[in-house]
């Protein structure tokens, strides 16, 4: 299929494929950040049920290190805030990639005289909401 395309169209198709790969990477990063965010929020919520005088430990690599309640809570709050920003940034990046994909797909279809089967259908495959 690609061998029959004009060089400009072949270049656009390669750009589409690159964007599709980028979209998949961004979606995977976003999913990982959302999972981490959910876990951190759950841990922060669990701190509400713990006595502030309880002995607490945090994981540092493969070790458990004793820590203070306030320090653990502050660290988790900071992590949650950071992850919320990360997820928001990835959502915006996902939107930009989707827009670029649709624009490029439209250009390719126009270049090929409106042939519907020119590029990958259904967007970059980022999935998710």
From Swiss-Prot:
Its main location: cytoplasm. Residues 19-35 have a biased composition (Low complexity). Keywords: Chaperone, Cytoplasm. InterPro entries: PFD_beta-like (IPR002777), PfdB (IPR012713), Prefoldin (IPR009053). One of its GO terms (molecular function) is unfolded protein binding. It is found in: Cytoplasm. Residues 19-52 are annotated as: Disordered. Heterohexamer of two alpha and four beta subunits. PANTHER family: PREFOLDIN SUBUNIT 1, PREFOLDIN SUBUNIT 1-RELATED. Belongs to the prefoldin subunit beta family. Molecular chaperone capable of stabilizing a range of proteins. Seems to fulfill an ATP-independent, HSP70-like function in archaeal de novo protein folding. This is Prefoldin subunit beta. It comes from Haloarcula marismortui (strain ATCC 43049 / DSM 3752 / JCM 8966 / VKM B-1809) (Halobacterium marismortui). The gene is pfdB.
């Amino acid at each position: 299929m690609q061998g029959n395309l004009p060089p400009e169209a072949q270049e656009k198709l390669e750009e589409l494929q690159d964007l599709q790969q980028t979209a998949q990477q961004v979606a995977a990063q976003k999913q990982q950040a959302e999972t981490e965010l959910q876990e951190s929020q759950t841990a922060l919520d669990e701190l509400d049920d713990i006595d502030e005088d309880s002995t607490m430990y945090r994981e540092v690599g493969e070790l458990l290190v004793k820590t203070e309640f306030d320090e653990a809570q502050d660290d988790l709050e900071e992590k949650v805030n950071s992850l919320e920003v990360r997820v928001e940034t990835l959502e915006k990046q996902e939107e930009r990639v989707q827009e670029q994909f649709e624009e490029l797909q439209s250009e390719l279809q126009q270049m090929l005289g409106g042939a519907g089967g020119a590029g990958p259908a259904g967007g970059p495959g980022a999935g998710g909401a």
